[in-house]
Amino acid sequence: MKISFSESQKLFAYFSGLIAALSLFIYYVSAQQSEGALILCITFGVIAAGIWFGPIYALAVTLIVLFVLGTLMMFFQTGQTSLFPAEEGLRMLVVWGIALLLFSFISGRIHDITAELRRSMTRLQSEIKSYVAVDRVTGFDNKQRMKLELSEEIKRAERYGNSFVFLLLHMHYFKEFKSLYGEKETDRLFQYVGQQIRTSVRETDKKFRPSDERIGIVLTHTPAEHMPAVLTKLKKQLDTYQLENGKYVSLTFHVCYLPYRNDIQTADQFLEELENEMMMNEL
């Protein structure tokens, strides 16, 4: 957050410098007649290119403008025709060239600092999201917390020889349900699912919502032989759901579970094994 504040100060300073320099340049150019408006239009174009696309584009436009104007000035002087006196034209071209280079640099820095602020904001939002450990709908922990708890459970199993099973429920037709009934009804559905799961497993079992359509449960001190009874109970609790309008819909899930094994060392390995060896039983 300290870095972002420093970048904000830099952005304010560059904007202030740009406004001050542009004001002085406009005052200087206002003394010109017909060419003054054209000079200002091109100058604003260079500044816009720098702010929107970065310093490289602004410098490229500046070099092209200076090259074209220098060529035209030489051409008109050679042809005995001049838009304005040679000495005045050269002075104007030099001043304008310096101003364009300055504006290119300042507008380019504004572009770079703004881009960095956007990246910092994106990172900050991602960090905040990762620190919000509890899903607002179900009250279950999120994916980051799930990995942390699973790692701790693996360590306890290695140290004390405990057994546990990780159970994953993947709801069928989640996207279709949300599209048909809306986000409010979907939140209500998962509030119901969360309540039913709480009544079906022990309080000491750890519940997670790693993604919108998935529920994960760490069944502590549970051998694999007990899983058929657990699945039967869950099937009974999650068989149907009553919509807010009073109608009932059937719920089905893909189910996979994996008991702890000695060859699994990390939570990532455990979850990868769970996905690869998914036993697709339909509740």
Swiss-Prot record:
The keyword Cell membrane applies. Its main location: membrane. Signal peptide: none annotated. Residues 162-283 form the GGDEF domain. It is a multi-pass membrane protein. Pfam families: GGDEF. InterPro entries: GGDEF_dom (IPR000160), Nucleotide_cyclase (IPR029787), Rev_trsase/Diguanyl_cyclase (IPR043128). GO terms for cellular component: plasma membrane. This is Uncharacterized membrane protein YdaK. It comes from Bacillus subtilis (strain 168).
